[in-house]
A protein has these predicted regions:
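Charged, amphipathic alpha-helical coiled-coil/dimerization segments
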Residues: 59-105
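Amphipathic alpha-helical dimerization/coiled-coil segments
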Residues: 2-3, 10-14, 32, 88-109
Length: 109
């Protein structure tokens, strides 16, 4: 069974669309900030203090289109069920990548 084309992906493949989305600045930070509960756009801007409101709104729109984030009036933005599953599955790999990037490679002397 062939994969359906995915809007927003350069290749049309779902996994590549997800990687494209994750490669955009602030995407993972937004998901991480939403892990404990819903936040307003203002609270997210405070948590992501280097992001402009325009960039955050663009990332939130992409995350909503991907089905990872929901928006409820009066409650703010929160993770969808798929977003929670994704974060649970992805964060060990993300934590490993962060540790690996922080370690200094040894050079042969």
């Amino acid at each position: 069974m062939a994969d359906r084309p995915v809007r927003g992906s350069r290749t049309g493949r779902p996994i590549m669309a997800l990687l494209d989305l994750l490669g955009r600045r602030w995407t993972l930070r937004i998901l991480w900030e939403l892990r404990d509960g819903a936040l307003t756009a203002r609270a997210l801007r405070s948590a992501c203090d280097d992001a402009s409101p325009t960039v955050l709104q663009a990332r939130l729109a992409e995350l909503r289109a991907a089905g990872l984030v929901e928006h409820a009036a009066g409650r703010g933005y929160g993770l969808s069920e798929e977003g929670r599953e994704f974060l649970t599955a992805f964060m060990p790999l993300y934590a490993f990548a962060e540790r690996w990037a922080a370690s200094k490679p040894t050079t042969p002397g």
